Amino acid sequence: MPYVLISTQIRMETGPTIVGDEFSDLVLMAQLEADKRTVLGNNFSEYYVNEPPRVTLNKLERLGYRVVSMTGVGQTLVWCLHKE
């Protein structure tokens, strides 16, 4: 999958970072050492890493991903990355 979205809460800029959902590439999630979690009350799962977004962005760059866009939505920061 060539696109990846990662996000974090502004008050949590030191982590954790959300790096995927239940349909994400399992190989990539393993490379990021992400844990799959389901928050009580949600009917979906997300993959998290316990590190700041900067560290995760650096890992993704080493894997060939590049940031396409970044935005803030309320208290959430979101990055979209693409791999050629």
Swiss-Prot record:
Pfam families: GFRP. Belongs to the GFRP family. The lineage of its organism: Eukaryota, Metazoa, Chordata, Craniata, Vertebrata. Homopentamer. Forms a complex with GCH1 where a GCH1 homodecamer is sandwiched by two GFRP homopentamers. InterPro entries: GFRP_sf, GTP_CycHdrlase_I_reg. It is found in: Nucleus; Nucleus membrane; Cytoplasm, Cytosol. The keyword Cell inner membrane does not apply. Mediates tetrahydrobiopterin inhibition of GTP cyclohydrolase 1. This is GTP cyclohydrolase 1 feedback regulatory protein. Keywords: Cytoplasm, Membrane, Nucleus. The keyword Cytoplasm applies. Its main location: nucleus. One of its GO terms (cellular component) is nuclear membrane. GO terms for molecular function: GTP cyclohydrolase binding. Transmembrane segments: none annotated. One of its GO terms (biological process) is negative regulation of biosynthetic process. Gene3D superfamilies: GTP cyclohydrolase I feedback regulatory protein GFRP (3.30.1410.10).
